[in-house]
Amino acid sequence: MNHTSFRAIVVNETESKQFVRNVVEREVSSLPEGDVLIQVHYSSLNYKDALSATGNKGVTRTYPHTPGIDAAGEVVSSEGETIKVGDQVIVTGYDLGMNTSGGFGEYIRVPASWIIPLPEGMSLKESMMYGTAGFTAALSVYKLIGAGIAPSMGDVLVTGATGGVGSVAVSILSKLGFNVVGATGKMEEEEMLIRLGAKQVIHRTELNDESGRPMLKGIYAGVIDTVGGHMLETALKTVKYGGCVTTCGNVAGQELQTTVYPFILRGISLLGIDSVQCPVDVRRDVWTLLASEWENKELLSYTEECTLEELDEKFTLILQGKLKGRTVINMK
């Protein structure tokens, strides 16, 4: 196997401040320093990847750059003792694909501390069917359960339910016995959400409270919010006493206007979900759960596979909110 050059998407910034993307040949020697060189077999597409690929300086500071915040593959060289040549591994989070050359290339070089061994019972492709979006969904459920939320306490709402994070959250919660309500702007995808385990599907406009009231009727024991903005504001008002809300996204807005009343009168909690710097012990636990108790083969039906060359169109679709389920990139 030739480990000297590889194919990758490279995003360049032109003199006119435009960003252009091409699949090019790169040298392995151009990769950043790191303990472990990995041949990437699969990657996956996330909203943050599309931001990086279109020149968002809040995600990626300098160009040229290879995006891809997820990668799964085989170790081809390692300077550490715990990770060996031939090991199958997953890398998500940290700086991968942001300012470190990412998974939209056939090779990555990263610190050993970023690497999680592929859990038993999970294939490399399956790991990227989850990727950062699926891991974030699982981490949200993990934190919700850790806060004491149980199926017997009532309905759990998932916002952005047809997206990469939301669809996995619906699937996991349903498997754990929760009564899941999925909120989406794509009511034509109601059947998909029902198949994933949602007991009820509502239009996102139902989470658009304009009453000005600090609290509404308590409906949900828990909420997994993936979109932020006004929907999160409304969701906070509708959580029952002792409930919990997790939040991990901002596609519906980064501002949050609320009052203290849901917190001091209903004792609710708001938990931020960060999958980037998640502690390694929690990261291992969550990936192990995804490979075992939380696995749901139904997700396979809502995963599309594509090549590097086909990614350009996907960037546009995900930024427009028109991509459903998960997209896996086959790098082999």
Please place each PLM-identified region on the residue numbering.
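N-terminal Rossmann-like NAD(P) cofactor-binding module of classical short-chain dehydrogenase/reductase
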Residues: 90, 221-224, 246
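C-terminal hydrophobic helical "lid"/dimerization subdomain
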Residues: 4, 284-332
